[in-house]
């Protein structure tokens, strides 16, 4: 859909390897094209990221980014329960809360080619509910 910069994948992988990291997530919001995301989705991303940081005690700028890389062995160190929209925020929560060597780096984000696949309210509410219920995993 051309939103994420595929040409940056080698850079993100090199960053992971060269810095001896376990997980790298990408922040789209700081380098986003003006027409890449509706105002409603920008507000939703801000709210979900705020909730992720508040409820889970981490500090990231883009909890909803779907561009991330990780070492294969990370899978055995995280407890992933979602197979839907919350997977992205869950993976970040798990990586940062479980003490993995994890960082967030900025990447460009472009306007989608084709239709937006998000159901704004349903997906947003589901992700928010997931953030609340995920807190039980770290009590």
What are these regions (language model features)?
Residues 1-3:
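The conserved acidic donor/metal-binding loop of glycosyltransferases
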